[in-house]
Amino acid sequence: MLLNPLFAQLGENRHVLVGFSGGLDSTVLLHLLVCLRQQLIPELNIRAIHIHHGLNPQADSWVKHCMQQCDQWKIELKVVRVNIDPRQNGIEAAARTARYQAFSANLAAKEVLLTAQHLDDQCETFLLALKRGSGPAGLSAMAAKMPFAHSQLLRPLLAFSREILENYAQAQQLQWIEDDSNQDDRFDRNFLRLNVLPILNQRWPHFAQATARSAGLCAEQEQLLDELLAENLQQLQGPDRSLSIDGLLQASMAKRAAILRRWLASLGAPMPSQSQLQRLWLEVAMARQDAEPQLMIGTRQVRRFRQHLYLLMPLAEITTNYLPWATVKATPNSSIIPLLPEPLWLPADLGVLRFVSAGGQAVRPATVGEEISVRFGLQGDIKIVGRHHSRQSKKVWQELGIPPWQRERIPLLYFGEQLIAAAGVFVTQAGQANENEPCWHLDWDKQLKLG
């Protein structure tokens, strides 16, 4: 009953990583895979991963149980200890986030991830989404198959109830862990499992199957919207994946909200609440023109610049505004261009600056005795190449179309106290290379990271 559906769901996949807690569900899944390897797919490569959350006094004994079980079934087991930070969304959400981060970090190149959620879990997920006031995306609950990390996540037991899994485990004389925290109904999921679903199932024995059908219909509607809005989203996005506010203004309120959700999802942001979506539009997109509005969605920041919305990753803090680079020393032959300094690693994951033989920004060479440094935070009046007059630094950034959050993170090259260039953006008249004379070429590699 369980083996053939699992065989069908695996398809051509022959390398699997199984989330193995040692509980009933994951024990059944792992046993089924072992049977599959023995009976149908001898080349099936199975690895298991156990996440030690450090939340239960018995956690170490659970690790021992999982190791013994995997040793008996000749399965490689990876045990990963994680740190849980419950401050933002509570223990349940924090544990889940840490768990899936560990899964992602340990998923090998050819592997797919398998987890053991079942029909009752799907029903609980649907009801929790209903309690939160979720729309069709949230009410879609859990997908049986979805992209994950560089691969896929499969939930092959999603159509089967816990009762079916328990009957299978008992028939196969399997041993599993009972987590005592599952009896604590202070947690929402446990409250549903212990106090609500038994009553619903007693009145309506097929309640879980019905909610699963509703979740499937919601998922279909979301997929249809994805297909219908894909072209609109593409048209409204710039090359930098920013989103046109003017384009959004042409859409109805419902369509605009759907496009915003898909834009955020495409960039890896968590699904925003209805309240967050309203704030995004009213407080960021529709803020007065001279404002610099921002809104946090999870750990990401939504900003506005020139009638476009941007979703920013968390930015590492720049803790110093001054970086000494080198002091130019005399060469044996004064007619020879001074030696180029070694590359300079920048703080806050900003990459590396270096002088190269060609390409980059052409600047005059530093003279003997000049100290080369890099600074952050442009101030004062600036006269750049190609402009006849000095301009205030803020005006320069505005004219060049540099968003406010990037301005303080652009390395500024100085020779002595003279500003020579803003890396990748402009060269000042003080830094201009003379025609037909030797010059240096400044290159900023933003992708290269130290370590």
From Swiss-Prot:
- Principal EC category: ligase
**GO molecular function term, any single one:** tRNA(Ile)-lysidine synthase activity
Biological-process GO terms, alphabetical: tRNA modification
Q: What does this protein do?
A: Ligates lysine onto the cytidine present at position 34 of the AUA codon-specific tRNA(Ile) that contains the anticodon CAU, in an ATP-dependent manner. Cytidine is converted to lysidine, thus changing the amino acid specificity of the tRNA from methionine to isoleucine.
UniProt record similarity statement: Belongs to the tRNA(Ile)-lysidine synthase family.
Protein species of origin:
Yersinia pseudotuberculosis serotype O:1b (strain IP 31758)
Task: Write the record's keywords in alphabetical order, separated by commas.
Answer: ATP-binding, Cytoplasm, Ligase, Nucleotide-binding, tRNA processing
Report the domain of life of the source organism.
Bacteria
One matching Pfam family: ATP_bind_3
- Catalytic activity of the protein: cytidine(34) in tRNA(Ile2) + L-lysine + ATP = lysidine(34) in tRNA(Ile2) + AMP + diphosphate + H(+)
Q: Which residues bind ATP?
A: S21, G22, G23, L24, D25, S26
GO cellular component terms given for this protein? cytoplasm
Its domain comment says: The N-terminal region contains the highly conserved SGGXDS motif, predicted to be a P-loop motif involved in ATP binding.
SMART domains assigned: TilS_C
- What EC number is given for this enzyme? 6.3.4.19
Q: What is this protein called?
A: tRNA(Ile)-lysidine synthase
Compartments reported by the entry: Cytoplasm
